[in-house]
């Protein structure tokens, strides 16, 4: 497995059917964090020509799509996954052509690591020497952040700092291009509609507050150390690979189960919440384009169209031939089918202590500067997700 340095610094093991690298060796970065250098253009060009990407959060929705994209473009892709008692690599297992016999010439490698462990991050950066870093790892569930605020800050805020500082400590500040997955939750209690790169932030959750620190520390390293460090302020983006606890996937999974007679109804929170939903596959293309631009900058990535959770439900149930009729208000609101069977209920337990009522992005800057524009519509997205979940639930009702 490639590590970018000596073979002796890499120890590998096979876990399940995936080979994971445990990187050792910190010497290259000791005492370097305060040195300043100007990298010659030829050296910089040769470094970047290697096309080596490091992805944190590679086992998630975005990480898996991004890995596919980068591999298709000829990159060597390294991903960081956390060691745990259970496997969470289902979204990326297909990227291994022959995982058991997979050796050093592979284009795809996984490494154990954690955003709370700075020494581990320094070792990985030192050994891999990535040309591009895509920082997607986070505790990204807004409601969970109210239950785990300190952990959310440790991973989402300080974790971003640790990764940036690992690059700086290894004297790769002027060579590595860094992408930080920022979020539309920064806008929270929105100050204008739609939201652009110039809209003031007003975070409304521990998650959003932690991500705001992440946003500004990226800007700080860009300005302080001349690092090619960028924020992608991504509005909600979904896919069949979306985590099961997020509202869109919760809806499409439940609709699939209902269509197969495995479930009767679904409980949700704020049905009136308005969101700008896009497809994750398109959004990772924007991430890549951000790092190919001539200069580092921050970009809103969004569709510019808005739907409520209620409308998302309507679209999902329409895919199984059911038209919902809505009755009541607030926690008393229900959605019934034509036979009067309640399909959607509202439960107070899914409300957040501070709600974000509306998010709508203005991605004109990305369109003009990067040539990026969302193409998949919400009805198309819902159709794909419901169809995928029906296939999943047919084969494995307990999934």
UniProtKB/Swiss-Prot annotation:
GO terms under biological process: 'de novo' GDP-L-fucose biosynthetic process; endoplasmic reticulum unfolded protein response; GDP-L-fucose biosynthetic process; GDP-mannose metabolic process; IRE1-mediated unfolded protein response; response to toxic substance
Gene Ontology CC, one term: striated muscle dense body
Record note on temperature dependence: Optimum temperature is 30 degrees Celsius.
Family: Belongs to the NAD(P)-dependent epimerase/dehydratase family. GDP-mannose 4,6-dehydratase subfamily.
A GO molecular function held by the record: GDP-mannose 4,6-dehydratase activity
Annotated keywords: Insecticide resistance, Lyase, NADP
Function noted in UniProt: Catalyzes the conversion of GDP-D-mannose to GDP-4-dehydro-6-deoxy-D-mannose. Involved in susceptibility to pore-forming crystal toxins in conjunction with bre-2, bre-3, bre-4, and bre-5. Involved in susceptibility to the nematotoxic C.cinerea galectin Cgl2, likely by contributing to the synthesis of N-glycans to which Cgl2 binds. Has a role in determining brood size.
Phenotype on disruption: Worms exhibit resistance to the Cry5B toxin produced by Bacillus thuringiensis. This is thought to be due to mutants having reduced population of glycolipids which are targeted by the Cry5B protein. Mutants also have reduced brood sizes at only 12% of wild-type N2.
Species of provenance: Caenorhabditis elegans
Entry's EC annotation: 4.2.1.47
Required cofactor names: NADP(+)
Protein name in UniProt: GDP-mannose 4,6 dehydratase 1
Main EC class the enzyme belongs to: lyase
Pathway it works in: Nucleotide-sugar biosynthesis; GDP-L-fucose biosynthesis via de novo pathway; GDP-L-fucose from GDP-alpha-D-mannose: step 1/2
Gene name of this polypeptide: bre-1
Binding site for NADP(+): 57-62, 114-115, 136-140, 151, 211, 237, 242
Highest taxon of the lineage: Eukaryota
Disulfide bonds: none
Catalytic reaction equation(s): GDP-alpha-D-mannose = GDP-4-dehydro-alpha-D-rhamnose + H2O
Location of the active site: 183, 185, 207
């Amino acid at each position: 497995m490639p590590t970018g340095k000596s073979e002796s610094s890499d120890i590998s093991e096979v876990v399940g059917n995936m080979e994971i690298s445990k990187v050792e060796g910190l010497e290259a970065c000791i005492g370097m964090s305060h040195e300043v250098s100007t990298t010659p253009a030829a050296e910089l060009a040769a470094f970047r020509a290697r096309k080596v990407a490091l992805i944190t959060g590679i086992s998630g929705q975005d990480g898996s799509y991004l890995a596919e994209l980068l591999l298709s473009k000829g990159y060597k892709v390294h991903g960081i996954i956390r060691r745990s008692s259970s496997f969470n690599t289902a979204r990326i297992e297909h990227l291994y052509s022959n995982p058991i016999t997979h050796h050093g010439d592979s284009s795809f490698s996984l490494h154990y690591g954690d955003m709370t462990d700075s020494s581990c991050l320094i070792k990985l950066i030192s050994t891999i020497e990535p040309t591009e870093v895509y920082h997607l790892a986070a505790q990204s569930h807004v409601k969970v952040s109210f239950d785990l605020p300190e952990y959310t800050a440790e991973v989402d805020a300080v974790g971003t700092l640790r990764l940036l500082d690992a690059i700086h400590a290894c004297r790769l500040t002027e060579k590595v291009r860094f992408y930080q997955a920022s979020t539309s939750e920064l806008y929270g209690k929105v100050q204008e509609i739609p939201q652009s790169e110039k809209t003031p932030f007003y975070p409304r959750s521990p998650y959003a507050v932690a991500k705001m620190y992440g946003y500004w520390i990226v800007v700080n390293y860009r300005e302080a150390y001349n690092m090619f460090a960028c924020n992608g302020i991504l509005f909600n983006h979904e896919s069949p690979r979306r985590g099961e606890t997020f509202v869109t996937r919760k809806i499409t999974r439940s609709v699939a189960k209902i269509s197969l007679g495995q479930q009767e109804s679904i409980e949700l929170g704020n049905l009136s919440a308005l969101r700008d939903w896009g497809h994750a596959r398109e959004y990772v293309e924007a991430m890549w384009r951000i790092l190919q631009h001539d200069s580092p900058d921050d970009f809103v990535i969004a569709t510019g169209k808005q739907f409520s959770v209620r409308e998302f439900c309507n679209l999902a149930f329409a895919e199984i031939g059911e038209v919902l009729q809505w009755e009541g208000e607030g926690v008393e609101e229900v959605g019934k089918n034509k036979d009067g069977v309640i399909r959607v209920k509202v439960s107070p337990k899914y409300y957040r202590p501070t709600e974000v009522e509306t998010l709508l992005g203005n991605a004109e800057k990305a369109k003009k500067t990067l040539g990026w524009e969302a193409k998949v519509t919400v009805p198309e997205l819902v159709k794909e997700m419901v169809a995928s979940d029906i296939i999943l639930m047919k084969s494995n009702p307990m999934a």
